[in-house]
């Protein structure tokens, strides 16, 4: 972490904390190393963007070989879809209440969207939210053993 300490020393007194500092070269090496390890084992990578919430980092991950991204909520999925991400998995079960159903339906117009579900009622509610085209939305059934 000498490189990190050098950067902190140079910035001392010039930035307010807390502040994110990303060492782009280190991050890129980590992305590439993770992807290489997974690819060597035949494992598809779908990173969770809730950690970084950064389109540029998501692009780097997909460019390195990730099959898509995982979002934590409809809003994250919308932001990444608007930035051109075409394969998104919503990891947390979503109940399509309020505006969520329409937002999910719109996402499926431009994005391969999959949503994790953990009960039959959620599947029915999501299908209803999709109107005449429930087949445009894919669901992943989550089983908690």
Question: What is each PLM-predicted segment?
Answer:
Residues 2-7, 26-57:
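N-terminal glycine-rich anion-binding loops that anchor highly charged ligand groups
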């Amino acid at each position: 972490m000498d490189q990190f300490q050098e950067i902190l020393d140079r910035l001392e007194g010039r930035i307010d904390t807390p502040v994110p500092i990303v060492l782009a070269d280190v991050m890129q090496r980590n992305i590439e190393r993770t992807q290489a390890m997974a690819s060597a084992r035949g494992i598809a990578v779908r990173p969770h963007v809730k950690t970084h919430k950064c389109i540029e980092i998501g692009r780097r991950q997909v460019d390195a070989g990730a099959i898509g991204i995982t979002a934590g909520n409809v809003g994250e999925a919308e932001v990444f879809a608007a930035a051109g991400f075409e394969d998104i998995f919503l990891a947390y079960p979503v109940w399509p209440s309020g505006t969520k159903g329409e937002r999910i339906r719109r996402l499926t117009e431009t994005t391969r969207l999959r949503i994790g579900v953990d009960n039959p009622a959620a599947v029915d509610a999501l299908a209803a939210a999709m109107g005449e085209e429930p087949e445009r939305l894919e669901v992943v059934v989550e089983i908690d053993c």
